[in-house]
Amino acid sequence: MGCVSSKQFKRAAQHEDPAILAKETTFSVSEVEALFELFKKISHSIFRDGLIHKEEFQLALFRNSNKKNLFANRIFDLFDLKRNGVIDFGEFVRSLSIFHPETPLGDKIAFAFRLYDLRGTGCIEREELHEMVLALLNESDLFLSEEAVEQIVDQTFKQADLNDDGKIDPDEWKTFASKNPALLKNMTLPYLKDITMVFPSFILNSEVCEEEL
């Protein structure tokens, strides 16, 4: 099969121009092109339609498309900016940009808040935090007693709920997260800064074979 130059990326792949995505995110053009290779692998793992479905997202995270996990579901829902049940390439790049090492801390804090705000009410309630703690433990294959989980929730609210109204608002979350940077360690993926090293340079420089699109 023939090959197309990176200038034909948008037309051939029917995805947004890498230059536009680079301008709107922390990624460079070459990093966006490298992410397209990753996007293709994920979006063709099950349905092969050029879109990432929840099962493919689960498979990429856990090597298991049937594993139920609130954490993975929340990440998928936040990546699905158009709320249509799938993730296209533009959504993939824009959302993944949050995890870039050079993305401002404030953006990471805001994303983490939305992650924990399960009901979308604009605040984090005790039940939501409890559910997310359990999900994160499950994702890490860790087990804590219910009493230990409640202690984590209690301590978090004791430190974060400054006005003691039983919920954590965005400003309280920002203050709490700024004082507890370990809370955001999962909001940074160091390899994204070196994503261009993952794939062959000839792919990044100019060519993507049509048979892979």
Curated annotation (Swiss-Prot):
One Pfam short name: EF-hand_7
Lipidation (N-myristoyl glycine): 2
GO cellular component assignments: plasma membrane
Single GO MF descriptor: kinase binding
Induction: By drought and cold stresses, and abscisic acid (ABA).
Keyword Cytoplasm attributed: no
Quaternary data: Homodimer.
Protein name: Calcineurin B-like protein 8
Record organism: Oryza sativa subsp. japonica
Source species taxonomy: Eukaryota, Viridiplantae, Streptophyta, Embryophyta, Tracheophyta
